[in-house]
Amino acid sequence: MQEASSAAAAGAEPGRRAAQHQFAGVDLRRPKGYAAPAPAPAVGEGDPCPRCASRDTKFCYYNNYNTSQPRHFCKGCRRYWTKGGTLRNVPVGGGTRKKPSSSSSSSSYVAAADADRQPKKKPASKKRRVVAPAPELATAADPGKTATTTTTTSEITTETGALEDSDSLAHLLLQPGTEDAEAVALGLGLSDFPSAGKAVLDDEDSFVWPAASFDMGACWAGAGFADPDPACIFLNLP
């Protein structure tokens, strides 16, 4: 016994202790009471596909974390299957199940969409002739309104005539050398006063200033002031 241990120690690396084979038949990596795992399949040999019987399959995962329902994928027909489950002909990336009625409804929907896309033709616009209504008969005029309008018009005419007469009179008076016949024709009676028209248009320089010997004191005396000098009025206040 000692010889075997010494031989093992001699064959071992220096500085390492010899391994003890006390639990030679026990796998310490697996807890006690669990069955040993199934041996891994050889490389290139997977579970046969239930559809195409191909061995080119691979394990994906356990369904619902249940080791009794492993899920596999077949690379030949690109289908999944689960052990103990039902087979479905649904390819990878495939859509949902279609009902026969859905195809007809989809075709009708496409036809309706195409109809909406087509431009709608505008109906031809009909030209309509618009006939003007016949003019209604004028209503009878109100006699009160007619009388008021006539009176107002006559008053305006009278005032306009009076203004024109006054303008013509001023024209005759301001024109020098107007013949007396025109005044007689208008009935103004200016022929008796031949100098009436000339008196208005006398020369502006014809005004005669009072003489230098004119006594201003007489005027101020009549007004109640005795001093003939107007400058002293404000100096001799009572």
Curated annotation (Swiss-Prot):
Any Pfam family matching the protein: Zn_ribbon_Dof
List keywords of the entry alphabetically: DNA-binding, Metal-binding, Nucleus, Transcription, Transcription regulation, Zinc, Zinc-finger
Q: What is its main location?
A: nucleus
* UniProt GO cellular component terms: nucleus
Q: Show the ranges annotated as biased composition (Low complexity).
A: 1-13, 138-155
Q: Which residues bind Zn(2+)?
A: 49, 52, 74, 77
Question: Which segments does the record annotate as Dof-type zinc fingers?
Answer: 47-101
Q: Which GO terms describe its biological process?
A: regulation of DNA-templated transcription
**GO molecular function terms attached to this record:** DNA binding; DNA-binding transcription factor activity; transcription cis-regulatory region binding; zinc ion binding
| UniProt name for this protein | Dof zinc finger protein MNB1A
- In its UniProt entry, the species of origin is given as Zea mays (Maize)
